[in-house]
A protein has these predicted regions:
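Context-gated lysine
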Residues: 2-5, 20, 36, 40, ...
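Internal, conserved structured core segments that host functional sites
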Residues: 1-58
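Short, surface-exposed acidic
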Residues: 28-34, 62-65, 89-92
C-alpha cells in the first residue's frame, strides 16, 4: 500500500534533506551508496528509513532513533495546531508533556515487531490527505 502522493513527496523531501545533512559531516561508504541510489531514483528517501540508516551510522541506538522520530512527528503535529490557532503555546507544551508516556509505550510495544508484520492503516487520515491534494489553497507545504 502506498501513502497518498502528497505525504509521500513530503516524506521523501524530508528524508533527502536529512541524508544530505548527515553526509556533510560524516564519511561512510554505506551512506554514500544509499545516497547514490536515492539520487538515481532507485530507492525513495522516505524520512523514517533515512532516519534509521543515519541513526545506525551515527551509532544511535534504535530505541533512541525511534524516540527521535516519534517525538519529532508529535512536535510537528502540535506545531501545525499551534499555527492554525487551535492551541496556544502553553497548551501545546501541555499536550506534548502528556503525550510523552504514550510515545514511550508505543516504542516499547512495537520496537520488536518484524518488518513483514508492519503496515499502514489510517483510512480517515488518507481521505483527508486525498482531499487536501485537490485543494487550490493550502495552509501548509506538505
Amino acid at each position: 500500500m502506498k501513502l497518498v502522493k502528497e505525504s509521500r513527496d513530503a516524506m521523501c523531501r524530508s528524508g533527502s534533506q536529512m541524508i544530505k545533512c548527515v553526509r556533510s559531516f560524516t564519511n561512510n561508504n554505506f551512506l554514500d551508496l544509499y545516497y547514490k541510489e536515492i539520487s538515481k531514483s532507485n530507492t525513495p528517501a522516505t524520512h523514517p528509513v533515512v532516519t534509521a540508516v543515519c541513526s545506525s551510522i551515527l551509532g544511535i541506538e534504535k530505541e533512541k532513533a525511534a524516540m527521535m522520530l516519534l517525538y519529532g512527528f508529535t512536535v510537528s503535529t502540535i506545531g501545525a495546531a499551534l499555527r492554525l490557532g487551535l492551541v496556544d503555546h502553553i497548551q501545546s507544551q501541555q499536550i506534548l508533556h502528556k503525550l510523552k508516556p504514550n510515545i514511550t509505550s508505543t516504542i516499547e510495544k512495537f520496537m520488536s515487531i518484524p518488518l513483514e508484520n508492519m503496515w499502514q492503516f489510517s483510512p480517515q487520515y488518507d481521505l483527508v490527505q486525498m482531499t487536501h491534494e485537490q485543494k487550490f489553497s493550502k495552509m501548509f507545504i506538505t
